[in-house]
Amino acid sequence: MSVRIEHDTFGEIEVPEDKYWGAQTERSKRNFPVGKEHMPIQVIYGFAQLKRGAALANHELGKLSDEKKNAIVYACDRILNGELDNHFPLVIWQTGSGTQSNMNVNEVVSYVANEYLKKHGSKETIHPNDDVNKSQSSNDTFPTAMHVALFHEVETKLEPALNHLRQTFKEKEDQYQSIIKIGRTHLQDATPIKLGQEISGWRYMLEKCEQLLSESKKHILNLAIGGTAVGTGINAHPEFGHKVAKYISQNTGYAFVSSENKFHALTSHDEIVQLHGTLKALATDLMKIANDIRWLASGPRAGLAEISIPENEPGSSIMPGKVNPTQCEMLTMVAVQVMGNDTTVGIASSQGNFELNVFKPVIMHNTLQSIYLLADGMNTFNKNCAIGIQPIEENINNYLNQSLMLVTALNPHIGYEKAAQIAKKAHKEGLTLKESAIESGYVTESQFEEWIKPEDMVDPH
């Protein structure tokens, strides 16, 4: 392998000739051969937005020349275009401040920027610390990159997936308003409900999660940039953070602002804890929805079988013809993973000792993973399951007509205790509810027909 020699304050080190990173990245690569979880590329893109904005801000404040500013912006734009993805090799298991990844970006930007300057005949040179990292610290850049990446992924991936699944349930809700089925509480028969009403509950869960997500993501717009090492802003112009936030906002279209309290921004990640709490809330709702659907679709001959769902693939390697609710199983596993991630994010975010939290990479990794799992999970669940939900009306009607809980409609007319006697007699003697009611002498046949109407029970008002 062809190599070149790079150096840092520790001395010289060999770096692959075809890679744009420098000495500090190479040392991290060698010092932390831990796991397979690489720093998410969206974090790198968040860094690129930041370094781009920092170059523009430093130039505006008279701290960076035109040539250097243009070169750094050029390099950052190449990163944002996805041209340099293979030059960011580090794993998340590194320093808890993300310093190595910050330097990885600084080194790649300086390498590409210097090529740009050389190509344009400039005698200027870009230094990864003195120019690309000017007015910055890893302590304020990594949390800034975290927030930029998280907001973008929520906006472009999670919210569209959530919206599409909600729309599907809304369509099913409207489509099945005329189908009356038996409700169930405690896994036991309850009073009737429309299939559309049941689905409306699922739809509203997602609608509420959209509202929670919209609220919690607002706090992610606060950026730590400008706090530098410990929140005091040492080595940065007082307006630097605000100007960087302005330039990031202009380039992304999102209304980022420099946090009003940098001491908080460096050591606390409560905004991400809140955001992930919303992801957990969504996961719990998706778990419930997926479980309801697979129970309602259980069978086909010995289950509830009130609905059918698409048959996507063979379900068993030994039982011919078996088809399983695999999309529901996938979504419930996604939900469990997100719940586990929430625990990790919460514990890691509680470790802000003094002026800095040093669990940032694992907070970021788990939060992004939850966003991607939820987005991908909802998209494939919607496409391969939810859209294809169909009622099996024969079974729905059989369960409805057999249910003893229709007796609830007699309460206002004969009282709870007499109605309970009718239900128990029917169950014990194998009678229909109507037969038991008439035999009890508490109601006549005409009264039963008048009072026991499932269609009135689902819309009592």
Curated annotation (Swiss-Prot):
Keyword NAD: no
Enzyme's top EC category: lyase
CDD domains cross-referenced by the UniProt entry: Fumarase_classII
Catalytic activity: (S)-malate = fumarate + H2O
Residues reported in the UniProt entry to bind substrate: 97-99, 127-130, 137-139, 185, 317, 322-324
Coiled coil: none
Site for Important for catalytic activity, residues: E329
A Gene Ontology BP annotation from the UniProt entry: fumarate metabolic process
Compartment annotation: Cytoplasm
Gene3D superfamilies membership: Fumarase/aspartase (C-terminal domain), Fumarase/aspartase (Central domain), Fumarase/aspartase (N-terminal domain)
Keyword Cytoplasm set for record: yes
GO molecular function, one term: fumarate hydratase activity
Family of this protein: Belongs to the class-II fumarase/aspartase family. Fumarase subfamily.
Keyword annotations of the record: Cytoplasm, Lyase, Tricarboxylic acid cycle
EC number: 4.2.1.2
Subunit structure: Homotetramer.
Biological or metabolic pathway of the protein: Carbohydrate metabolism; tricarboxylic acid cycle; (S)-malate from fumarate: step 1/1
Further comment found in the protein's record: There are 2 substrate-binding sites: the catalytic A site, and the non-catalytic B site that may play a role in the transfer of substrate or product between the active site and the solvent. Alternatively, the B site may bind allosteric effectors.
Protein's recorded name: Fumarate hydratase class II
A single Gene Ontology CC term: cytoplasm
Residue numbers annotated as active site: H186 (proton donor/acceptor), S316
Function: Involved in the TCA cycle. Catalyzes the stereospecific interconversion of fumarate to L-malate.
Gene for this chain: fumC
Chief place of localization: cytoplasm
